[in-house]
From Swiss-Prot:
Function in brief: Catalyzes the dephosphorylation of undecaprenyl diphosphate (UPP). Confers resistance to bacitracin.
UniProt similarity note: Belongs to the UppP family.
Top-level EC class as recorded in UniProt: hydrolase
One Pfam family from the record: BacA
Protein name: Undecaprenyl-diphosphatase
GO CC list: plasma membrane
Highest taxon of source: Bacteria
GO biological process, one term: peptidoglycan biosynthetic process
EC number: 3.6.1.27
Membrane topology: Multi-pass membrane protein
Gene transcribed to yield this protein: uppP
């Protein structure tokens, strides 16, 4: 893997992890357009580590408060908004975790085709548009209820379908529940922390079972750094943009991307 390939793939991972545009669609498109070989599991682990570091660093102050208040709730000091948000992140991860354990083999065998990815990219773009137009957009993430946690958590499980976009489907669900665009995105990004950690851990187990030979450690480290920096900038500017714009540009992009994938692979 050369320098240019490392930079492109790390940027794709860092940007598509948090934008509602489907990382699977891009990760199938890039090799098709470039004819590159598979980058290997070690590189995937590195870019996931970079993305995870980015979201943890970006929300470090919120995470510190949430952790302290969560520990306080365990000690019987009541359920403050930050403690409830911490519980919401943990409990909201359960549906996707269970679905991943139960349906991983089925998804890997039957749903990783380019056609499925293209149709999911298009279909969930339409749903995102509907949520953006119809949602009340009056609530922030600290007003979250257990019903919200269940709905958004189940929605996140749908992201196991390639082409859905984890951030896209969780933002969609949060908008439908009345959250503002920024609050929907913030909760989605907080939810990504345990999910990315679980995915990275699963990949590390695979790497331990079947170690790769001739790992290019320089490119691995570079990939993690590029993915991390690009993910951090993506989170920062995406949240700023949501204060001024709708989801329409991302919907249009997904529709065009999905149509292009159908054109290439149908």
């Amino acid at each position: 893997m050369d320098l240019f390939q490392t930079l492109v793939l790390a940027l794709v991972q860092g940007l598509t992890e948090f934008l509602p545009i489907s990382s699977a669609a891009h990760l199938i498109l890039v090799p098709e357009l470039t004819d590159w070989d598979d980058q290997g599991l070690a590189f995937d682990v590195a870019t996931h580590v970079g993305s995870l570091a980015a979201v943890v660093i970006y929300f470090r102050h919120e995470l510190r408060r949430m952790t302290a208040e969560w520990l306080g709730s365990l000690a019987g000091r009541g359920l403050t908004p930050d403690a409830k948000l911490a519980w919401a992140v943990g409990l909201g991860t359960i549906p996707a975790g269970l679905a991943g354990l139960l349906f991983h083999d089925i998804i890997a065998t039957h749903l990783r085709s380019a056609q499925v990815i293209a149709m999911a990219t298009i279909g969930f773009a339409v749903l995102l548009l509907f949520a953006d137009v119809s949602g009340k957009r009056t609530r922030d993430e600290h007003s979250i209820t257990w019903k919200d946690v269940l709905v958004i958590g189940v929605a996140q499980a749908l992201a196991l379908i390639p082409g859905t976009s984890r951030s896209g489907i969780t933002i969609t669900a949060a908008l439908l529940m009345g959250f503002t665009r920024q609050a929907a995105a913030r909760y989605s990004f907080l939810l990504s922390i345990p999910i990315i950690a679980l995915a990275g851990g699963f990949e590390i187990l695979g790497l331990v079972k079947e170690p790769e030979e001739n790992i290019q450690w320089g490119m691995i480290v570079l990939g993690a750094l590029v993915a991390g920096v690009s993910a951090y900038l993506c989170i920062h500017y995406f949240l700023k943009l949501l204060a001024k714009m709708t989801m329409l540009p991302f919907v249009i992009y997904r529709l065009v991307l999905g149509a292009f994938l159908l054109f290439l692979f149908w």
